[in-house]
Amino acid sequence: MMVFQSFILGNLVSLCMKIINSVVVVGLYYGFLTTFSIGPSYLFLLRARVMDEGEEGTEKKVSATTGFIAGQLMMFISIYYAPLHLALGRPHTITVLALPYLLFHFFWNNHKHFFDYGSTTRNEMRNLRIQCVFLNNLIFQLFNHFILPSSMLARLVNIYMFRCNNKMLFVTSSFVGWLIGHILFMKWVGLVLVWIQQNNSIRSNVLIRSNKYKFLVSELRNSMARIFSILLFITCVYYLGRIPSPIFTKKLKGTSETGGTKQDQEVSTAEAPFPSLFSEEGEDLDKIDEMEEIRVNEKDKINKDDEFHVRTYYKTVSENLDGNKENSNLEFFKIKKKEDHFLWFEKPFVTLVFDYKRWNRPNRYIKNDKIENTVRNEMAQYFFYTCQSDGKERIAFTYPPNLSTFFEMIQKRIPSFTREKITSDQVSTYWSLIHEEKKENLKKEFLNRIEALDKGGSVENILEKTTRFCYNEAKKEYLPKIYDPFLHGISRGRIKKLPPFKIITETYRKNNIRGSWINKIHGLLLKLNYHKFEQTIENFNRKSLSIEKKLSFFSEPQQEEKFNSEEEIKIFKFLFDIVRTDSNDQTLIKNFIDFHEINKKVPRWSYKLISELEELEGENEENVPMEPGIRSRKAKRVVVFTDKEPHDEIYTNLKENQNSDQKDEMALIRYSQQSDFRREIIKGSMRSQRRKPVIWEFFQAKVHSPLFFDRIDKLFFFSFDIWGLKKKILKNFISQTKKKNFDKKEEEQSKIEEKRRIEIAETWDSFLFAQIIRGSLLVTQSILRKYIILPLLILIKNSVRMLLFQFPEWSEDLKDWKREMHVKCTYNGVQLSETEFPRNWLTDGIQIKILFPFYLKPWHKSKFQASQKARLKKTKDKGEKNDFCFLTVWGMETELPFGSAQRKPSFFEPISKELKKRIKKLKTKSLVVLRIFKERATIFLKVANEIKNWILKNFIFIKGKIKDLSKRNPISLFGPREIYELNETKKDSIIRNQIIHELSVQNKSMEWTNSSLSENKITNLIDRIKTIRNQIEEISKEKQNLTNNCTKLRYDSKKIESSKKIWQAFKRKNTRLIRKSIFFFKFCIEQLSIAIFLGIINIPKITTQLFFESIKTILDKSIYKNEEKGEKKKNPFYFISTIKNLISNKKKMSYDLCSLSQAYVFYKLSQIKVSNVSKLKDVLEYNICITSFFVKNKIKSFFQEQGIFHYELKNKTFLNSEVNQWKNWLRSHYQYNLPQIAWARLVTQNWKKKINKDSLVLNPSLTKEDSYEKKKFDNYKKQNFFEADSVLNPKHNFKKDYIYNLFCYKSIHPTENFFDMYVGIALDNCLVSSCLEKYNIRGMREIWHRKYVDWRILNFWFTKKVNIEPWVNTKSKKKYINTKVQNYQRIDKITKTDLANQKSFFFDWMGMNEEILNHRITNFEFFFFPEFFLFSSTYKIKPWVIPIKLLLLNFNENINVNKKLTRKKKGFIPSNEKKSLRFYNLNKEEKESAGQFELESDKEKKRNPESALLNQEKNIEENFAESMIKKRQNKKQYKSNTEAELDLFLTRYSRFQLRWNCFFNQKILNNVKVYCLLVRLNNPNEIAISSIERGEMSLDILMIEKNFTFAKLMKKGILIIEPVRLSVQNDGQLIIYRTIGIPLVHKNKHKISKRSKKKSYIDKKIFEKSKTKYQNKTVNRKKKHYDFFVPENILSPKRRREFRILICFNLKKKTARDRNSRFDKNIQNLTTVLHKKKDLNKEKNNLINLKSFLWPKFRLEDLACMNRYWFNTTNGTNFSMIRIRMYTRFPIH
């Protein structure tokens, strides 16, 4: 039952998948998709369905629907029917049909009475309206849809059309699918309209029911035709923007096809048959149309013979091959004559109106310097051709075009080559059988190898080493090695790249006239008349191949296979029969000296365009005198210097140093700051068809892709970023609490100002006639300022001074006025001169710069009036202040062009300051007078106080007497009386007081006799106080009652109360003032009297003090004047003093010597020009102690003076330079404190033994093996190295000797890290500054940013070698230490003969100059073997390894001395070392160390070492060098060989690019601006000094020296050298390399050491060592499981991948689970390779099985390998496996 259910389920799934992948379902799906391509035709259809009513409306609906369906049916038929597709697919067809019809329809709707003839009921088809509705829907359906573009659907349909067999069924089903989708869409629209009509909520709306709405609806219904006409007009304009207009677009002038050379019209198929030099957005329709015409109408066929041409290079000779002069032109050059006769008749009318060869689309024009016109990219990215895929013949869209053309050529040329048509089933079965057989063979071989390995066979025999191309598997017959594509290295030989044909000289021809070889394939394809010669079959020359082996690209010594002579003849019978030409006939040999190339004529654009920028620069004036065809960024050519009338002295000097072809003017290109909308498009192309920019605003400043819509500052209602809004609010809230950062504000303000300035400049530049208006205004403002305004101001100022009885300042003002200069500048601010205007200044713009602007001053101070402090402040302000400005249109001044106006110094500001100072002085003087008066008036105050006290005493006495008299007469008859008008409350209080007073008086009178006077007083007072208290309490109670009764006071009462309070307060203050005024007057009188008396006393004291101060100031002025004169004589410019200060500061700098190497120290010691080196040499050589008795006293005293040794410490021996001491010094620095692994990798084998033995080794810097010998010191002394002679400059040498000795001492004593360079000398071209200034921090990691090193640190010579190994890998994850040496970086040894025989030749760094002809620029070994990329990558990471000056100045190479001998001696060197280093091996010591190379060199010696190939190489090299030198001399006359060599290096071998500093760029521009002005001035001293003071001109970049090298520029930090990856040349060798290079990467992983190789891939010694070394680990396999081999690694990488692919693909179309069913049975046998089943438990066994036998069939890298091999895609980045997904997994029936 379960089986039955699974069977039913499987059938259902398969049935469903078949239905889904059927043609009908896919067609329905694509048809349904096209329903959503809503175009303008839907407007007419909806209009007919919605608006029209009645009988005529139904007829219109029917006609609209009919036309709509008919138009869509035409579109679907055009997919299958090619003529209809050609008619509708061309752009001019739509233009001719659509635009006139749109205009007709527009006028039809506007003027109905012209076309309305009325309607007849009998024959409605005569009604023109119904016919127009049908035509509208039919024609508009053919237009391009604009909501969902039909181009995407068309591409999908076209792709599917190639895949399916029943194409008509697919078209029909797609049309049915569209019809179903259209019916559903219309039904949905009808339902929506019915819902709107029936919805009460919409109909019951107040607005809809209003009369106004009804009126609007009726108007809308009446004007619907007008609205549709407007919409159609907009659509018409929209299409006009996207369709090229035949009249208004710009026509380009095409170059004549016959005018170019043959090289311009043809391109080699070997380089690129259809190179994508021109990137189009869409396919070229013309080529597709032609292909479809050929496919559909098979009658018209292109003659294939006319497509292919042969490109030959030879000299014209008197006789042809067969001796007939009439047949001198070959047959394949007769094509042009046929085309000329029928050229006019073949051109249709359309091409006269529409130039189909023009760029109508906004494409980019990509230049190709090698050819004249660019190749038309007519194939997009696909090339269609039939091929076998999965056993079936399919159309592949990524087929290699080279193979297709080659296959067609073979089909034409070989008549016997016919293909039998086989059915698809036979092909698939045959294909599957072949691959099944291959898989079985591979499986058997694989299992046999595993069994052999399990039995204990040798690894060398089991591993598969090579893969050969076998064309007969039964007999195991292979292709020859030289033509086997699976092989590489010396067996393939080396194909030499011939030089350009102009350089081939007669000597080269003579050396090569030994007979030429013609391949039989070339003879078949080229159809040459060589069959008339005698054909002599010669055996294959093995010697030529063996010689070629030496120059292979990836050379590896491989074991040769021997063939019998009969087998060789069979192999070469068809392909390699060699035709020997007549050796006596020299003319024939000359014709066949050069090679023949198979070419195919490719279509080219008939235009050679230049850009507007090139026209401005004037580079292509001679070559292309046409107008530019490419729109560049808006730019203007500004001439900044013209040398029309040079001075005689300057001109003669310039003439000697300059070439004759030097231009007399210098111009700069000024670019516009606006956003560039044109984007380098071609003139006449439609800008609206650009893909990326989308315009969604009314005015959009910058056009960009909608991809970056989220980064735009959008409006609030467009932005939905709530989190960003929260962040902004929080940020503002937090920023309020924090302090404001003023630096950021200033920076933002400057950015805003700069942006505003650029906007103003662009607005002036964009408007018409704006520059003319601005220029005229600037010139008038300049004249007004200079000659009218400023002289008037001077006149007014001096006249006012004369009126105020002061001396006028005519001379000072006129001097400042004359100093002001109005310099005319370009629009960017480049200065020209006062009188010379820039060229085309009215159109290009002008700036006027004012130097030393005049400011009116109220007075001029004397030079010695200010103090020294004020003068220093003034100079400081002057340095910061700019003494120039730019003039604006309004007469204002700005610091930068179009900047904001500056504030002028005020005329009245110094006057106000002076007044304030004087007022302050008066105040201080008055205060002093008052103080003195106060001090002196104390005496008078004492007297006044005594008088005052006496008067008061007398007054008190008189007052007491008066009181006594008043007591006796209490009732006063006379007294004043006051009358008041009081209110009721006050009257009551007065009455009560009177009553109380009367009572008291009565009591007094009653008790007069009984009590005394004092007692009565006290009692009376007590009683009065009590009564007053009681009254106060009563009054307060009354007030409370009143307030309770009246809650709200009136406004008048409040006003009265407030006025009362104010009056009372004023009364109190007034009484207080009256009371205290007496004391105030007294105080004033006292102060005045004191001041007067003090002033009188101190008058003589003040006068004497002023007298002494005036004398002192006069003396100070005179002293300061003398000092100033002395300073002027010493330092005329303050900037020179700053330079001196910098130099003096450098002397005091301290440096750390911890990073100095011992080699550097002793090398510097070797350069000392005095004889003190011998003392140190004697001590170091004999290794004696300085305290011994055998050392001379002179040597002891020398070392004691130098501080190396102190003689008093007798127990301390001399710190000699043995390795032990040197090790101790190294251990003190952590960068040298390396582990044992690193030391094992850093040193050679001899050093390893010494380190393991812990023995002392002598100093490596003085041994013969590593560095400088005794003899080399003499050679160094002979060389100058740009130093002064020791005899002429002894003082300099003495100082240098001292410093170098100090270096030696500091290197031996590392504890003292710093020293002071108090000796005033700059070492060897700023040696200290360049090498040591950044070394005061220990550790090399912190100085990796350095880009230059002093070249004198180590003098490398790349001709002999010393071993130093880079790329040390100290990371070891495994338990053992791998001490094998992978590679070596070669550094030189110097011998006497080399120094004596040095000859300046081409630059030979990294072997670039050896075999210049054959050496390609791109070294492809570095891409797959990064460990070989020694110098460039090492230098990139560690720039202190190789000095920079060496890269540019060491051009010495010993080439011509015994070249034949060196070639014999050098033997065989693998090409990877040869390519990267190019060194010769001449030393005996290295011959012994590299003895394994001699095995190959002995083999080469046995053969003919001086063969024709080496001679040919030598001759070509020499001739090429001579021709290159002649070429360079004709172009440019160099001053020295160094300049010529450097130019050759930079142009041809520039592996490093030079980049200057970003700060240096601005300095250069500023200097150029100043130079342009200084050149035109007669006396430029003042301007030069002021520009240096302002910082406009930089002295550090001035080229003062004549021979200024690149190394010095790099030392200054101006130029920076950077490694750069070179561009790839797509030539034939690259294609061959890419096809072969993939297996080489995997094979290289098995390589261990280049030195220890013989013939195999695995070194026996290392393998045996590893076996013995790790035997104890690998014997017990239970404990440790080392996967030394994954079993599939037994096969070669290519066979391994083939095996995987054959297993992964189901050849017999089984289910996925049965793919590896056969192979799974053998998995159990594979476990015996490494382990036995007895010794393993289940978990480990499963783990190893999982690890070893997880076949990577689903890995991406394997898919990429399949992609590379099967689909001809060599670039991994363009991963085209995605295209495979376009084919469905299941077959289509």
UniProtKB/Swiss-Prot annotation:
Part of the Tic complex. This is Protein TIC 214. Pfam families: Ycf1. PANTHER family: PROTEIN TIC 214, PROTEIN TIC 214-RELATED. Involved in protein precursor import into chloroplasts. May be part of an intermediate translocation complex acting as a protein-conducting channel at the inner envelope. One of its GO terms (biological process) is protein transport. It is found in: Plastid, Chloroplast inner membrane. The chain crosses the membrane at residues 19-39, 68-88, 91-111, 133-153, 176-196, 227-247. Belongs to the TIC214 family. InterPro entries: TIC214 (IPR008896). It is a multi-pass membrane protein. GO terms for cellular component: chloroplast inner membrane. Keywords: Chloroplast, Membrane, Plastid, Plastid inner membrane, Protein transport, Transmembrane, Transmembrane helix, Transport. Its main location: plastid. There is a partial copy of the N-terminus (positions 1-341) of ycf1 in the inverted repeat (BAF50246). The keyword ATP-binding does not apply.
